[in-house]
Amino acid sequence: KDNNLIKDYKASAAEAMKKDDGNFFTKYGNFFLKGIQNTILISIVGVLLGTVFGAGIALLKLSKIKLLSWLASAYIEFLRGTPLLVQVFLVYFGTTAVLGLNISALICGMIALVINCSAYIAEIIRAGINAVDSGQTEAARSLGLTYGQTMKSVILPQAIKNILPALGNEFVTVIKESSIVSVIGVSEIMFNAQVVQGASFDPFTPLIVAAILYFILTFTLSRVMYYFEGRMKVSD
């Protein structure tokens, strides 16, 4: 299925090459637009779901139950200690070749990014929770709040505020790292740049366009994060 998709992309790019208007962006602009859409989609899914799973893993690591804490630590250390490229291949070939599931390359790429993000975000959240004064936990417990209520009403709201800049940086990192999923045929920016390279016989221009697009996405996101950081400081 994915191989057919790749052939379709290459056929479309070759067809675009036959256009005689001589304008690179008129010929291949749609490929880069499609790449931008998928890059943004993959990154958003990776960060959002990674945050959800990462929060759970962070709480497990902070658990007083040693087995749960050890398992969470092992999960985090393994994913942080192995390349994302290897993780992408493990998910892709593990789901398709080993388990025999018919899952698209796009979904496999998303799963790999979510798993990878969850490990890094778990550490961010854990650090944010530990940064909250322990006296607040003791005060909340003395008022009769349970551990769960203390986390929900006292600790996490402060921790989230503390970790927002780090989460923004993780989002920027994921946008750049999403290029790795091109190796399994996901049509994000880098994959489509390679398709255009093959169709146009121009090895340089598509890479320059891809680099500019990644820069625009990451720079825009960074500016947005700086804006919200400034608003948060004013509110304090």
Regions found by a protein language model. Give the residues of each.
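Transmembrane alpha-helices and adjacent helix-loop boundaries
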Residues: 2-236
